[in-house]
Every structure is written in C-alpha cells, then in structure tokens.
C-alpha cells in the first residue's frame, strides 16, 4: 500500500478520535445511524434474495449481495460510523502512532455500541410493526447476526 494512503488513513483516525472527544453525542448518533442502515439493507437484501429463491437462487444471492452493498454506500454518504470501517482506519492510525491505543479502544467501543443500539432499535420497530411475520425469530437475531463476531472469527480457525 502506498505510504500516501497510510497517511490518509492515519489522518482519518486522528479526526475520528477528535470527533469522539469533542462531540461524543454526535459521534454516537453517527454510529446509531450506521446500525439503522445495516438493518434496512439486511431486510431489503433478504426480501430481494427470497423473491428469487424459488425461481433462480443464484440470481437471488447475487442481487441480495448487491442490495446489501447499498448500505455501505449510504453509510459513507452520510458520514456514519460503522464499526468494521473504524477497525481499519483506527488500526492504521495506531500503527502510524498518530493516535493512542486507548483512543482506538474508545472509538471501537462507542462505534460498536452505537451500531448495536441502531440495529436493536430498528429491529424492534420492524418486529412490532408486524413486518417480520415471525417476531420470535427476528427480535434478537438481526442485531446479533451483524454485530457479533462468530466463534470461528474469535478463535481464528476456519
């Protein structure tokens, strides 16, 4: 990776740490919004994928993946704070010694909690609105599926 790109990531890490320190409520709200968009994209992706399930499952999976990518675009366009993106940016900043590991931990924690809260709120609204059809299934599943690492990810085994 060119060093200029590393510098850009490092500067972004400094800006994220500064935003969290100076405006924690604003930063948390950005993380919640990222969680909202992830849930919206997940629901829409499932609808698109299930629409094609009986006729052409391969197209359903492809289109479902494309639709889910829209969430990432929305998150970038509104400047929301997605935990996975913060992992990349903050790690570069810490390795380049532009931010401390304590700042990295704070950004990761707040963005993770904000993403989870956003997922939880919109998932509950989705279920209480009766849109899920099976409230018991969706109540906790949506948030846990997209915010929690799997045991394989933690252990490193594949």
Predicted regions and their residues:
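The first (N-terminal) embedded transmembrane alpha-helix
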Residues: 29-45
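Short, charged cytosolic
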Residues: 1-10
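Membrane-interface interhelical connector segments
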Residues: 132-148
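A structural feature that tracks compact, well-ordered secondary-structure segments
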Residues: 39, 73, 77-128
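Cytosolic juxtamembrane amphipathic/interface segments immediately preceding
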Residues: 10-27, 98-99
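Alpha-helical transmembrane segments
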Residues: 63-71
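Single conserved hydrophobic/aromatic residue that forms the stacking wall/gate
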Residues: 146-157
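Interfacial loop-to-helix junctions that mark the boundaries of transmembrane helices
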Residues: 52-63
């Amino acid at each position: 990776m060119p060093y200029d790109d590393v510098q850009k990531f490092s500067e972004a890490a400094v800006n994220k740490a500064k935003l969290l320190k100076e405006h924690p409520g604003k930063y948390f709200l950005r993380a919640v919004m990222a969680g909202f968009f992830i849930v919206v994209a997940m629901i829409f992706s499932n609808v698109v994928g299930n629409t094609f399930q009986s006729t052409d499952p391969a197209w359903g999976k492809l289109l479902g993946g494309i639709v889910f990518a829209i969430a990432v675009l929305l998150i970038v366009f509104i400047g929301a704070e997605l935990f996975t993106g913060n992992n990349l940016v903050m790690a570069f900043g810490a390795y380049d010694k532009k931010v401390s590991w304590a700042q990295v931990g704070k950004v990761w924690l707040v963005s993770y909690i904000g993403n989870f809260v956003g997922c939880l709120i919109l998932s509950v609204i989705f279920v209480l609105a009766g849109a899920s059809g099976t409230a018991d299934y969706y109540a906790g599943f949506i948030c846990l599926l997209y915010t929690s690492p799997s045991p394989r990810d933690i252990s490193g085994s594949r």
